Amino acid sequence: MQEKRPTLDGLEQILELIASDPRIQPNFSGWIRASLRSGGGKIRVLRYISDHARSDGAPPQILDVGAQFASLAVYAVKLGYHAAAVDYGPAAKTFQKVASDHGVDYKECDVGAEALPFPDNQFDFVTYTDVMEHHAFSPKRVLREIQRVLVPGGRVIVVTPNHASIYNRLKLLFGGSVNDDFDYFFDVCADERIYDGHHREYTRAELRAALGRTQFQVLECRVFEQDLIPLLHYLRRHRTRGEIFPESRDLFLCALGEIWALLHLPLDRWIWAVGEKTGDGKT
C-alpha cells in the first residue's frame, strides 16, 4: 500500500530496509541508520514534490543527483513516484543493486566528467541536495545537465551549507576555521587520491547567481536550520538501545535555528533553493 504523505517514520523504515540488506557493508549500515538525524531534509524535499506534483495526477518523475544509498529515491518509489538516481564512487555499485531491487533506476555517473545518462525533457523534479559542496569543480556543468533532463516547467531543488551562517562567522572571529576538520583532512585522508569532504561552500547570493546563470528562474532561495524533531526521534531510538550519543551540539544548534526563524534572521546553516526550467532551457 502506497503512503500518501512523507513521514519521519516512513523514512526510518526505508533506512532500515537499506541498512539491513546483506549486500551493505556493516560500516555503511550504521552510517545509513544515523542519517535519520538529519532526515528532516529528505522529508522537506519529498513534501515539496508532493505539494507541487502535476495537476493531472500523474506520478512525478524525479531524479536524485548524488544519491549515495538512494534512501530518498527508494522512499519516492514507495510514495508512488517514478524515481531515478545517479552517483559515483567505490560503493555506488552496491547501492545501485540494492536501490534497483526497490524500483529505482540507479545509474553510475561521474557528474563532473559525464553527461547525465538520461534523455532530454524527462524529469519533473531533480533533487541536488548536499552535493554541490563536495564538488572539486564548478557546478555549472551539472546545473546545465539538470536543465537538459528537466521538462519545461520542471524544478531543481538544491540544498547546500550556508557559507555565511552565523556559526561560520563566529568561528572566523575567534580564530577558527570554517573548513572541514583539519586533522581528518591532513591525516586520515592523506592517502586518498580524491578528498570527499567539502571543497567549496556557497552563500545565498552565490547560489541564486549559479541558478540564474544556468537559465533557471529562481523561485525560492532562503536559509534554514535542520529540524529538531528528526534528531530527537533518532536520539530516542538510540537511547532505548542503550547506546551513547554525543549529539548535544546539534541539539543546541537546531534549537538556536528555531530562534533565528522566529526573529526572521538569515543566520542558519543551510540554504534551500528551487529553480524552474523555463522555455527550452538552452544555455
Predicted regions and their residues:
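Conserved SAM-binding loop
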Residues: 46-53, 57-170, 272-277
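Short polybasic linear motifs
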Residues: 283
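Basic/polar N-terminal segments that are highly enriched at the extreme N-terminus
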Residues: 1-2
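S-adenosyl-L-methionine-dependent methyltransferase catalytic module, highlighting the catalytic core
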Residues: 5-40, 98, 108, 114, ...
